[in-house]
A protein has these predicted regions:
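Flexible, D/E/H-enriched segments
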Residues: 1-92, 96-100, 120-195
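A structural signal for small-residue-enriched, beta-sheet-centric alpha/beta enzyme cores
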Residues: 116-118
Length: 195
């Protein structure tokens, strides 16, 4: 799409520019690599893009003038959530698609979403973060699906990014398990860059 609506913007509507040319290139690359993908040029008006994208728009791209291509991984809705191995491989192909695009444009790849939540699982968070830092593809591809439950499933976004950035080094900026209750509920927050 030429632009994406952020329906969760607190004041009025917000539209972000898209990049149809690169999007079509990525889609065709995925099809050529036998990666099943769904495509939409319009989101439901009263829903727009989800909060994971809205956070990036407001915090990372506040001017709203950089074209974006939202790639949504089904982290939450069973029964067809991708395995972490599939996520890693899709990330690799995303990077291959971008690298094969004949353009001088600079492209950044970002991911958002939890580490563990709504019940914090520091162990699985730390395993995933350590594997991303050490470029441990085997560990990333074999994270136990039975531990990727509730919001913790969003670790799939991190694994997808790890596949895309496998030739770069991750710099963990911070990891904070933010507990809300003594029962262990809350949200673990992680922030990292790759270079």
């Amino acid at each position: 799409a030429r632009e994406w609506r952020n329906a969760q913007e607190p004041v009025g509507d917000s539209f972000q520019p898209g990049h149809p040319e690169l999007a079509k290139h990525i889609i065709q690359h995925f099809v050529n690599q036998n990666i099943d993908i769904s495509v939409t040029n319009k989101l439901q008006d009263d829903i727009g893009a989800g909060h994971a994208f809205a956070f990036l728009y407001r915090q990372i791209l506040p001017e709203g003038n950089i074209p974006i291509i939202p790639l949504m991984v089904n982290c939450f809705y069973p029964p067809n959530q991708p395995t972490v191995a599939r996520c890693y491989d899709v990330g690799k192909e995303l990077r291959a698609a971008i690298d094969s695009w004949e353009s001088d444009a600079r492209v950044a790849i970002m991911a958002s979403g939890g580490l563990s939540h709504f019940i914090i699982d520091e162990e699985i968070d730390r395993i995933a973060l350590a594997a991303l830092e050490s470029k441990d593809e085997e560990t990333l591809k074999t994270l136990p699906n039975d531990r990727l439950i509730l919001g913790t499933t969003e670790i799939r976004n991190w694994v997808t990014l790890g596949g895309a950035m496998e030739d770069m080094t991750m710099n963990l900026i911070d990891y904070q398990p933010c507990y809300r209750t003594l029962a262990g509920t809350g949200c673990a927050m992680g922030f990292a860059t790759w270079s």
